[in-house]
Amino acid sequence: MASTTTMRLALFSVLTLLSFHAVVSVTPLHVQHPLDPLTKEEFLAVQTIVQNKYPISNNRLAFHYIGLDDPEKDHVLRYETHPTLVSIPRKIFVVAIINSQTHEILINLRIRSIVSDNIHNGYGFPILSVDEQSLAIKLPLKYPPFIDSVKKRGLNLSEIVCSSFTMGWFGEEKNVRTVRLDCFMKESTVNIYVRPITGITIVADLDLMKIVEYHDRDIEAVPTAENTEYQVSKQSPPFGPKQHSLTSHQPQGPGFQINGHSVSWANWKFHIGFDVRAGIVISLASIYDLEKHKSRRVLYKGYISELFVPYQDPTEEFYFKTFFDSGEFGFGLSTVSLIPNRDCPPHAQFIDTYVHSANGTPILLKNAICVFEQYGNIMWRHTENGIPNESIEESRTEVNLIVRTIVTVGNYDNVIDWEFKASGSIKPSIALSGILEIKGTNIKHKDEIKEDLHGKLVSANSIGIYHDHFYIYYLDFDIDGTHNSFEKTSLKTVRIKDGSSKRKSYWTTETQTAKTESDAKITIGLAPAELVVVNPNIKTAVGNEVGYRLIPAIPAHPLLTEDDYPQIRGAFTNYNVWVTAYNRTEKWAGGLYVDHSRGDDTLAVWTKQNREIVNKDIVMWHVVGIHHVPAQEDFPIMPLLSTSFELRPTNFFERNPVLKTLSPRDVAWPGCSN
């Protein structure tokens, strides 16, 4: 039995925010919110409506995207104010390939009818379906030239698995749905991505579902399976380093409430949505102002709009690997079920959702999202020794709310968190794990390297290829209303030349309001600046405009030339921050159709309109990037590599909003006495 003192110290980290406590309630039966994800019944209704028009008996029909058609913002805001008086019809946007043509279909579920049905004639194709990829990866295993290549390498065909990779666009005039197929050895390890079969080019046509291009160029060694297994059941002692168990105890239950997809916690309220392309969507984030006695809107909607992953190997083996994980594979379709007590702590609450197959059938995705509280840090503190004969110590415990989901696209796992703080901050973060993209080589030691490998030798015969991860967040701020502005406050050095001070210099600030979208293209560098979205129509008691500041992630800038084909498609990474006039249809930074796209429908193209953004409904886009130079510690599976940014209130409140917040009090463990 631990001592009482030890127990109290341990209980200090108990995740019970008693000052804002509410018992959790996950309510399965609730009034549907206009932004709720599609239900099983809605997916089935969409499937039926489309198949009634295009019977599968005489049409080749595949659903590539089924998602909520965003309601008009003013309708949603009126619903928030008067939910019983405002009725918003559920409209569903469908992208389907029917007889080799891409259809954009809008369905009104209230009247169970197709409102519009248009054919996309431009460049690019929709998200790849899981079904067609599953068929394509089997093609090499029955393809005689590939079977001959396997025999030539002395490999066992039954121990080979293949994977599909989008091909991008490199100036070709043809507009055909093709993928590259790379194959790997699964013999003696499930860690297939570290055992590539190098030197073979395989291209498959997804519409014809056959191999249309094949080259066996050269033979490189297949990296060994030794020390690559990551399944604990396949590993043997010694294990380590040893970790001791940590237990959290919430005797009065969690401090948050879930009603359908709406979450209340501490002073925050927000909605959790889900989309087969975007994955998790945070909407209608409002915070309660204790002094003003009302909730105040901060963020109308936020999600990851795109993830651009360009590899930096220009050779035949890798040049095409310039992936757009959201637009080509779907963040929602790639979301995985969270593992209780591993991906999320024991006290987490889980939310299920649905995605769809290529034939439109809904697929239950259990534990897609988890919500939990965790001890954060110190909320605020001060020790005052300046008053004679008095010693003053004040400190407050910080407990934060986390909303988490994990997206696994091929070899990489993306842990996506939205962290809410009672102090008013929202902190989105990304943590990467998974497997490096490995290129096989005959080189076993660094001393053998005679040319640029385009990566690092992380193990014998294994090159971890240089690459980037560029996430772009869509952040539709509504600071106390829809009319906002974007301000850049630069910190300027001032020299004192008149001898009025013993100092020779100081710094001050200079604020500029971006008038147009061009003014709001920001490259974050060495020059310090504050980037703030303000409501110019509402001011604090002392006259400051209320606002929220972006504390950006550590900046990463694209290193490809602007005329390189991948960078043309990923031109939204040219700046770290963009601000655009709100347009309901401008959701995807890489364009609606990303596979084989040509960069003609991206954030970089939209902003050429140079629309006015002063005192308008505006959207901020923040690029969060990581230049990944692989290291041996990333092999055979990499520990989490994380980055984050913060949306922090700036003159939004009259004073510190958590000044009167009480720390969670110590509680007794069951079965233990004080």
Swiss-Prot record:
Stated name of the protein: Primary amine oxidase
Native organism taxonomy: Eukaryota, Viridiplantae, Streptophyta, Embryophyta, Tracheophyta
Q: Name one GO biological process term.
A: amine metabolic process
- Disulfide bonding pattern of the chain: C162-C183, C344-C370
For the region Disordered, give the residue spans.
226-251
Output the superkingdom of the source species.
Eukaryota
The stretch of residues making up the signal peptide is: 1-25
The record lists the membrane-crossing segments as none
The record's EC number reads 1.4.3.21
Per UniProt, where does Cu cation bind?
H467, H469, H628
Q: Where is the active site?
A: D325, Y412
What organism is listed for this UniProt entry?
Pisum sativum
Q: Which reaction does it catalyse?
A: a primary methyl amine + O2 + H2O = an aldehyde + H2O2 + NH4(+)
**Binding residues annotated for Mn(2+), in chain numbering:** D476, F477, D478, D617, I618
Q: How is the cofactor bound?
A: Binds 1 copper ion per subunit.
Compositional bias (Polar residues) at which positions? 226-236
- Residues that bear 2',4',5'-topaquinone: Y412
